[in-house]
């Protein structure tokens, strides 16, 4: 497993062979620098939960946080808490609407300040994949199959060639998610955005039978936690990543070694498109036993994993259970204190 993942929980059948998934509390192979990460869903919190890390290495030194980069996750959580008073149905990864014997499951998202790196690197053909991924990965956590997607593209002055590249990426993302690009909105707003820049939002709708909804309520002690690998940073934490880049003195064109021995540039590593997990997750669901799914995005492990737990349950994860991609190692050199909460770790 690698850092950054969509996590799902399976009930471990009696006599599960050791070659298969192991309980998160079991010993895992890896380097001696082990951290035991504990995540718990308490009765009071919808997202924020206590976290403890026990490490055999020295205590963490003071370092950079997401808030230092201008993003206050606590403020976002407080806004969700307030909105919940007006719209009690929110709080899941996707919103469920009853429709006959099914639920329509909807989600909306953007790609944040990853757009800034797209402008700086000139990589625009995959940002649309990121946009689709952020919404469809949310709705598949309920077991829903994505049906269609809509996009919103806004800019000060429409560059047709640039917009075509972006929308081609959206079409590619929809193909990966096996859904239809049903429509969208192109908004040209003079003087609102900087020249050559644009903003994106996406909206996905899927469906799942009411008796097939995955909501985590049947998770029990002893269930197994499984992670699916990411391609890198995906589409969260880029305000912090850009701050690290600024302070490191590196440029987006500098070389960054990969685990497979091949080198890539820092810009290419950061711009790697978000994995669309729809097909592999639906295939796993079809085999039975999946009780809960979490899409690890903003808030990282600490906020997203407990969202699928019944009150009072938690998870133990050994941090040496996966191979960390080089881009995370590079970011960690900046002594990011809240990596688990910011960058899908």
What are these regions (language model features)?
Residues 2-345:
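Helix-biased detector of long, well-ordered alpha-helical tracts
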């Amino acid at each position: 497993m690698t850092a950054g993942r969509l996590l799902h929980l399976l009930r471990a059948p009696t006599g599960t062979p050791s070659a298969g998934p192991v309980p998160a509390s079991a010993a895992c192979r890896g380097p001696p620098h082990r951290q035991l990460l504990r995540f718990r869903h308490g009765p009071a919190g919808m997202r924020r939960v206590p976290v403890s890390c026990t490490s055999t290495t020295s205590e963490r030194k003071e370092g950079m946080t997401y808030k230092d980069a201008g993003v206050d996750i606590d403020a976002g959580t407080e806004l969700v808490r307030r909105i919940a008073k007006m719209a009690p149905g929110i709080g899941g990864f996707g919103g469920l609407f009853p429709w006959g014997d099914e639920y329509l499951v909807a989600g909306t998202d953007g790609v944040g300040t990853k757009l800034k790196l797209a402008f700086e690197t000139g990589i625009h053909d995959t940002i649309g994949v990121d946009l689709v991924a952020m919404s469809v990965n949310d709705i598949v956590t309920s077991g829903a199959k994505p049906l269609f997607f809509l996009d919103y593209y806004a800019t000060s002055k429409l560059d047709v060639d640039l917009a075509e590249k972006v929308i081609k990426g959206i079409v590619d993302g929809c193909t990966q998610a096996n859904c239809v690009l049903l429509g969208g909105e192109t908004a040209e707003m003079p003087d609102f955005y900087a020249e050559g820049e644009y903003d994106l939002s996406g909206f996905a709708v899927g469906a799942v039978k009411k008796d097939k909804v995955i909501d985590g309520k049947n998770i029990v002690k002893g269930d197994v936690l499984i992670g699916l690998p990411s391609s890198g940073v995906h589409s969260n934490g880029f305000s912090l990543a850009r701050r690290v880049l600024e302070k490191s003195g590196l440029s987006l064109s500098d070389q960054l070694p990969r685990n497979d021995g091949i080198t890539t540039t820092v810009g290419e590593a950061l711009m790697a498109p978000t994995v669309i997990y729809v097909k592999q997750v639906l295939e796993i669901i079809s085999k039975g036993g999946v009780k809960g799914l979490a899409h690890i995005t903003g808030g990282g492990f600490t906020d997203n994993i407990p969202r699928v737990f019944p009150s009072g349950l938690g998870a133990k994860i050994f941090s040496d259970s996966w191979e960390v991609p080089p881009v995370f190692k590079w970011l960690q050199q900046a002594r990011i204190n809240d990596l688990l909460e910011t960058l899908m770790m």
